[in-house]
């Protein structure tokens, strides 16, 4: 045990008084050198980290160089009386102003493009509405023409039908009148019934009709012709 923890008197240690923080730091370092890693804890790492502020300062300085403060690089942001934010440029060369001018120009260009698109869309809608209105008028005219043409065809059909019907009625009346006249003339002849019967048959081919021999009937009618005293005359 005495070998691991030799008396402090045997060590060449300078106990020159310094501020409390340096004494604590030197004491911890000496203890760490003597004991090594055998009794090292997480608290020792924390104390060592706190005892080396110079390293942390270097890291903070490197971070600030890589990522400078926005307010110090591009200007401070302040609020006016109306509560709107204003940006004051911290660059003497006006580079930040140029960046904001470029941004505002791009924004205005975008708004101009939107206005142009809106105007183009409105013009297209107006043209489309005019085209639809003209198409509706043409369709209405075509519809009216078709209706007039259909009415004309229907009228022509009924006119033609009525004319044909009247003509057929006239022809039928004439045929009936001619038939009645012929009938009256036929029965008004000064002859016998057998004479009129003989007029109704074809004397040239009256011998065979429908495969039957009619020559005997023809011979009888020829004998009764002109005989007013014959039975049934």
Curated annotation (Swiss-Prot):
Coiled coil region boundaries: 125-186
Biased composition annotated in UniProt, kind: Basic and acidic residues: 17-43, 112-124
Domain of life: Eukaryota
Keywords: Calcium, Calmodulin-binding, Coated pit, Coiled coil, Cytoplasmic vesicle, Membrane, Phosphoprotein
Record region (Disordered): 1-124
Membrane among keywords: yes
Membrane topology: Peripheral membrane protein
Primary site of residence: membrane
Polar residues: bias regions: 69-92
GO BP term (any one): protein-containing complex assembly
Signal peptide: none
Phosphothreonine: modified positions: 49
Subcellular location: Cytoplasmic vesicle membrane; Membrane, Coated pit
Location of the region described as Involved in binding clathrin heavy chain in the Swiss-Prot/TrEMBL record: 144-204
InterPro entries: Clathrin_L-chain (IPR000996)
Positions of post-translational Phosphoserine modification: 52
Cellular component GO terms held in the UniProt record: clathrin coat of coated pit; clathrin coat of trans-Golgi network vesicle; clathrin complex; clathrin vesicle coat; plasma membrane; trans-Golgi network
One Pfam entry name: Clathrin_lg_ch
Acidic residues bias: start-end ranges: 56-67
Job description of the protein: Clathrin is the major protein of the polyhedral coat of coated pits and vesicles. In yeast, it is involved in the retention of proteins in an intracellular membrane compartment, presumably the trans-Golgi. The yeast light chain is important for cell growth. The light chain may help to properly orient the assembly/ disassembly of the clathrin coats.
Assembly, per entry: Clathrin coats are formed from molecules containing 3 heavy chains and 3 light chains. Interacts with the auxilin-like clathrin uncoating factor SWA2.
Name of the protein in its database record: Clathrin light chain
The organism of origin for this protein: Saccharomyces cerevisiae (strain ATCC 204508 / S288c) (Baker's yeast)
Gene encoding the protein: CLC1
């Amino acid at each position: 045990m005495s070998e691991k923890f030799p008396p402090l008197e045997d060590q060449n240690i300078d106990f020159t008084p310094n501020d409390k923080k340096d004494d604590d730091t030197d004491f911890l370092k000496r203890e760490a050198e003597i004991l090594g890693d055998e009794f090292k804890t997480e608290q020792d790492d924390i104390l060592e980290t706190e005892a080396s502020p110079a390293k942390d300062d270097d890291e903070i300085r490197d971070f600030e160089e890589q990522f400078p403060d926005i307010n110090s690089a591009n200007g401070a942001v302040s609020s006016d009386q109306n509560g709107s934010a204003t940006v004051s440029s911290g660059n003497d060369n006006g580079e930040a102003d140029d960046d904001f001018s470029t941004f505002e120009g791009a924004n205005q260009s975008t708004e101009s493009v939107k206005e142009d698109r809106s105007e183009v869309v409105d013009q297209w809608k107006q043209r489309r509405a005019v085209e639809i209105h003209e198409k509706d008028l043409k369709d209405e005219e075509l519809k009216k023409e078709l209706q007039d043409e259909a009415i004309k065809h229907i009228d022509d059909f009924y006119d033609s039908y009525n004319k044909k019907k009247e003509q057929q009625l006239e022809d039928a009346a004439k045929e009936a009148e001619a038939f009645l006249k012929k009938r009256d003339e036929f029965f008004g002849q000064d002859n016998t019934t057998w004479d009129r019967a003989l007029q109704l048959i074809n004397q040239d081919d009256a011998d065979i009709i429908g495969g039957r021999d009619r020559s005997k009937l023809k011979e009888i009618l020829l004998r009764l012709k002109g005989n007013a005293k014959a039975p049934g005359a």
